[in-house]
Amino acid sequence: MASVLIREAKEGDCGNILRMIRELAEYEKLSDQVKISEEALRADGFGENPFFHCLVAEILPAPGEPQGSCMVGYGLYYFIYSTWTGRNIYLEDIYVKPEYRGQGIGSKIIKKVAEVALDKGCSQFRLAVLDWNKKAVDLYKTLGARDLTEAEGWHSFRFEGEAMRELAGK
């Protein structure tokens, strides 16, 4: 197989990233929840004060092969803050196209996010996974992550739409 490059996403990658976001949502059986547009990704990730950062995985052609590189995965992350431990990084999405899974590409993306976290002085690297995604759970544990639901009993909550407007009195 040709080599894999993990690099920072560029604004021009947003179309491919959005396609993979939709593929991930379909895999997670949550396609109806994707409301983001390519324009929003450009504005939110590549403006003056980006809300997120993104890494992409590309398969580079072997020397002499006629085709160009092929984007096969991504990891979208942002920085958060813990009142207990300070700077943290949160991996919102990690996705590798099905035909490229099992080749270590997801691990390479995760390791690169860990590098970024350490370079930025983060004390923790957080992520969430659906309970039925056993392969991902096993991968994260193999890489050294602790399952906080098992270890500490945390539940994750979300306010959205009408509940958020009602809460804010708007």
Curated annotation (Swiss-Prot):
Catalytic site: Y140
Reaction(s) catalysed (UniProt annotation): S-(2-aminoethyl)-L-cysteine + acetyl-CoA = S-(2-acetamidoethyl)-L-cysteine + CoA + H(+); an alkane-alpha,omega-diamine + acetyl-CoA = an N-acetylalkane-alpha,omega-diamine + CoA + H(+)
Native source species: Sus scrofa (Pig)
EC number from the UniProt entry: 2.3.1.-, 2.3.1.57
SUBUNIT field: Homodimer.
Family: Belongs to the acetyltransferase family.
PANTHER family xrefs: DIAMINE N-ACETYLTRANSFERASE, THIALYSINE N-EPSILON-ACETYLTRANSFERASE
Gene Ontology, cellular component aspect: cytoplasm
Protein's cellular compartments: Cytoplasm
Record protein name field: Thialysine N-epsilon-acetyltransferase
Modified residues (N6-acetyllysine): K29
